């Protein structure tokens, strides 16, 4: 898998029109992430449009609810043909297992590939101080992320979303067959934005990430196609 297939661009835009315009300006991008704002505004039709163009889709809605509700959402996402989807690891093992079972069961019924379920460990906007003071978790960032990743493995989840700073730890702890997707990626020379635990693309891959998620460095660039190709070149893709 080359570098272009491993760099996911976040379509963090307000509506379908803006999203489609960006996709058309950056045909080199093969994997797009659709999150809460855009999915709420544009609905499933945008996913279907992306799939019709031959794009891969990471549906990042971070499901977190009772197991039965999450299972229903995962079946619906599977019918859309998404490649990756997210659930919150803090939903607990019954919810995580229900998500995986729903995806595999619906895919088998349809005769199509099942999306990989990724457990979100700790949002990259949170750091140790916020974790301890506001969430009352006092095991530290690495300890908390490791605990949730191990929970995900034991629940049959195919991978995790985590900060690049925890990638090496989780690669060692969870093995080479476990998918690791890292947001909070900032190419050299770009700012951190609202994400506190960041690395460059090359650093994240070196620590064991399978996929990187990049947003504003591409989506707000004067030429998104050029910006994306520069990131791929940075990681030797």
Curated annotation (Swiss-Prot):
One of its GO terms (molecular function) is orotidine-5'-phosphate decarboxylase activity. The active site is at 62 (proton donor). Its EC number is 4.1.1.23. SMART domains: OMPdecase. GO terms for cellular component: cytosol. Pathway: Pyrimidine metabolism; UMP biosynthesis via de novo pathway; UMP from orotate: step 2/2. SUPFAM superfamilies: Ribulose-phoshate binding barrel. One of its GO terms (biological process) is 'de novo' pyrimidine nucleobase biosynthetic process. Signal peptide: none annotated. It catalyses: orotidine 5'-phosphate + H(+) = UMP + CO2. Substrate binds at residues 12, 33, 60-69, 124, 186, 195, 215-216. Keywords: Decarboxylase, Lyase, Pyrimidine biosynthesis. It comes from the Bacteria. NCBIfam families: PRK00230.1, pyrF. Belongs to the OMP decarboxylase family. Type 1 subfamily. Homodimer. Catalyzes the decarboxylation of orotidine 5'-monophosphate (OMP) to uridine 5'-monophosphate (UMP). This is Orotidine 5'-phosphate decarboxylase. It comes from Gloeobacter violaceus (strain ATCC 29082 / PCC 7421).
């Amino acid at each position: 898998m080359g570098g272009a297939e491993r760099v996911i661009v976040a379509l963090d835009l307000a509506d379908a029109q803006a999203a489609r315009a960006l996709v058309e300006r950056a045909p080199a991008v093969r994997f797009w992430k659709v999150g809460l704002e855009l999915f709420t505004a544009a609905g499933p039709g945008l996913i279907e449009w992306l799939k019709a163009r031959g794009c891969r889709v990471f549906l990042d809605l971070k499901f977190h609810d009772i197991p039965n509700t999450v299972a229903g959402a995962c079946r619906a996402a599977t019918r859309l043909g998404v490649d990756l989807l997210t659930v919150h690891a803090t939903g607990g093992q019954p919810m995580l297992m229900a998500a995986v079972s729903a995806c595999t069961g619906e895919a088998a019924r349809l005769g199509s590939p099942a999306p990989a379920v990724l457990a979100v460990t700790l949002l990259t906007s949170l750091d140790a101080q916020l974790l301890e003071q506001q969430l009352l978790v006092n095991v530290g960032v690495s300890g908390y992320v490791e605990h949730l990743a191990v929970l995900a493995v034991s629940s049959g989840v195919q991978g995790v979303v985590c900060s690049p700073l925890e990638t090496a730890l989780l690669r060692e702890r969870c093995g080479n067959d476990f998918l690791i997707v890292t947001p909070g990626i900032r190419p050299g020379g770009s700012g951190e934005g609202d994400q506190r635990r960041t690395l460059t693309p090359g650093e994240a891959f070196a620590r064991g990430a399978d996929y990187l998620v990049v947003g504003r460095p591409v989506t707000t660039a004067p030429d998104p196609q050029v910006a994306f190709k520069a990131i791929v070149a940075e990681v030797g893709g």
